[in-house]
Amino acid sequence: MEDTVIVGRHAVREAIITGHPINKILIQEGIKKQQINEILKNAKDQKIIVQTVPKSKLDFLANAPHQGVAALIAPYEYADFDQFLKQQKEKEGLSTVLILDGLEDPHNLGSILRTADATGVDGVIIPKRRSVTLTQTVAKASTGAIEHVPVIRVTNLAKTIDELKDNGFWVAGTEANNATDYRNLEADMSLAIVIGSEGQGMSRLVSDKCDFYIKIPMVGHVNSLNASVAASLMMYEVFRKRHDVGEI
């Protein structure tokens, strides 16, 4: 199976720390070693090959800002949905999952994973069709969070929502109209929050499966927010409702 290339110091460091299989780390010629001391130490401890290469090679492999560091890793694996449900049943406390319906921008997915990790979201669900996948761009945008937040890829979102409901989740869809202000969201139950695509919103089949709908009030001239911004507001609202000020 072909290696995946990840770039950037945060992404590479998290891949090493979490034990993601790494075949080789590439370091740009002339980079100051003190800037990457932690990466070099961890790589040595785990006996990972480190190779110094010209900047032009990193530029070619990365096709994006790389901070002088890249790694050739095994492709990212998706979490198993049935195993995920089992883990949620066994955990203490309430669960939160994000469902991304038609999100195609890898930067948005990376940003969402970063916030999901920060707020303790248990997993992110994406469909196999009409959706971004786990790529180098997602990994870099997530600044390493891709190593910590399970991403589940499913064939049928509507069926997946039914299974979540059967396992105690309430499903909240994000809508612009005929919806409750997200600040009034009740978070005292396990939640699955659906974020639709920026252009189309939720698909009809997915929307019909939601238990209730929430919206983000807006008073400006634009009529929608970036999907990652909307998702972040939702995740932090759930976090705020479940954790008292000063608790964390």
Swiss-Prot record:
MF-aspect GO terms: RNA binding; RNA methyltransferase activity
GO cellular component: cytosol
Residues reported to bind S-adenosyl-L-methionine: G196, I216, L225
GO biological process terms on file: methylation; RNA processing
Keyword hit for Endoplasmic reticulum: no
UniProt keyword annotations, A-Z: Methyltransferase, Transferase
SUPFAM superfamilies, sorted: alpha/beta knot, L30e-like
Taxonomy, superkingdom: Bacteria
EC identifiers of the protein: 2.1.1.-
PANTHER family: 23S RRNA (GUANOSINE-2'-O-)-METHYLTRANSFERASE RLMB (PTHR46429:SF1)
Family listed: Belongs to the class IV-like SAM-binding methyltransferase superfamily. RNA methyltransferase TrmH family.
Descriptive protein name: Putative TrmH family tRNA/rRNA methyltransferase
Species assigned in the record: Staphylococcus aureus (strain MSSA476)
